[in-house]
Each structure stands twice: as C-alpha cells, then as structure tokens.
Amino acid sequence: MGTMIVDSGISVDNADPEVQEQKTSLHSSRSRLKGTVQVVEFVIGDELFAVDLFDTREVITTPEVTSIPNAPTFITGMIDLRGVITIIIDLRIMMNIAKESSGKKKSRIIVLDKTVSDKMIGILVDDVYSVTNYSKEDIDQEAHSSAEGHRDILGVIRKSKKDAEGKEKSSLVIWLDIRKMIGRIEKDL
C-alpha cells in the first residue's frame, strides 16, 4: 500500500474503494500475524490519542471552515477538499476535553477513510505527531473496559522513548475506536 505526504501530513492511497478494502483486509491479517498495530498519533489538549491508520485517508492543514447553521456543537462546519464537501468534527468538543494544548497550536484535520462513513468526514485535532507501529504487547485492551463511558476506546498504548538525557520516558496513548464514535453520531451529519 502506498503512502504519501500531503500538506505536511499523511495520506493513504484510496483510488479504488474495492481494492483499498482488499488491501486493508490483507494488511489487517498481516498485522494480526505479526502482532503489530499501525496508528496515527495526535494530540488534543495535552493528551495523546491515536486512531487506526487504515481508518484514515490523509492529514491536512486546517483551511477556512464554513459553518453549518443549526448543526450540533461538535460539528465545526464543512470544507471543500479538492471538490468533495467534507464535514469537520471537532474531537475536543465531541469528547468534552476542555483543556487547550499547552504547545504551539498547529491544528490539523485527519480526513477519515470512506470505509468509516458514507460521508466524507474530517476530525479536527490540535496536532498530528506521527504514524507509529506498536507491538500488541504495548497495548492494554482491558484497563479501560470496566469504566463507564469508555466504549470508544480500543486500548491504552504504553509509549516509551528516550529523552535528551538518554533517560527512558513513558507516556500513555489512548487508542480511539473512531468507527464506533462516528457511527454513533452519523445521523447528525
């Protein structure tokens, strides 16, 4: 599967939906065998989140967004993305995250794959960090399951990296079930 950079972001080649579905299915099978997961990592407020790479199409810088009258508060508006009207959802509002990002604001839109919804949808986030592979051993899929209201979380990823001094630093990345989240609000779109 080819990936390319678009507007300082990531794009997954989706020329033919049927071929893309076969590629996604094939890759998912390979990932399960290898025991790895590919995610797009992003930040909202000061928290790290991730969505499955194959639920995304591309990442773009935030263009001017046209408001939609009487839309739910989490719908920021719509954009014209190369001739296709794309609805923009503010994930901060949808997930009730009040805290603003403490870093420089470089908001991005993650455009979701056509397999996620019948409509073209983009999710507004504070910044996109990377596309990362994680071993399934790095993912805790049980920690969140007992908590009420966490049905949109696929797991919690333990991310380790070395800081400038060479010390091991770890953080948690919340792996979102973006398909379930969009499915729940699709009637409002």
Q: Language-model features: where?
A:
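An acidic, low-aromatic, low-complexity terminal/linker signal
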Residues: M1-L189
